[in-house]
Design a protein with these regions (language model features):
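Divalent-cation
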Residues: 1-165
């Protein structure tokens, strides 16, 4: 998955992180808190704060333990709440899975340049297919267009209840 970006869902002003399949057409919108949305946006934009934020601290802890974050995976949705796991290889080479909120997992993955995965059953159940022309405009950073506006309107119309699973 790739992080398309952080958006604000209207009219609730709730931040969402929008993930997209790398080799597909499905999107996965995940509602997140404002602090986590900021942490994700900072990582996407390469903003380095003067002091470590929580996710920077998490990265430092993993690295200081001679471990590696190999990937993060959005695994499920339960009662409208997304679940995720951090996939870590520890100093002895053992694979360890740690439960996490998707927002924290994504923020950490962006900082460590780790893969972001989504369970295929989850994408089958709650992934959203967006028409190719609209999706391409959303991923194209060259400027505003009517297609981008249509994409934003689509985002404005979806809500967390659509993903109650």
């Amino acid at each position: 998955m790739q992080v398309v970006g952080v958006r604000i869902e209207m009219p609730s002003n709730q931040p969402i992180v929008l993930l997209k399949e790398i080799d597909g057409v499905r999107f996965l919108p995940i509602w997140v808190g404002a602090v986590e949305a900021t942490a994700i946006a900072f990582a996407q934009q390469g903003v380095i704060p003067p002091r470590p934020l929580t996710h920077d601290l998490m990265q430092d802890i993993v690295e200081s333990l001679d471990a590696t974050l190999t990937a993060v995976q959005v695994t499920a949705i339960e009662e409208g709440v997304f679940m995720a796991s951090l996939l870590i290889r520890n100093s002895e080479g053992n694979a360890v899975s740690v439960s996490a909120r998707p927002s924290d997992a994504i923020a950490l993955a962006l900082r460590t340049h780790s893969n972001i995965l989504a369970d295929s059953d989850l994408l089958d159940n709650v992934g959203i297919e967006i028409p190719e022309d609209v999706a391409q405009d959303a991923l194209n950073a060259s400027g505003e267009s009517s297609e981008m506006e249509r994409f934003r309107e689509f985002l404005d119309q979806i809500n967390p209840e659509d993903f109650a699973g």
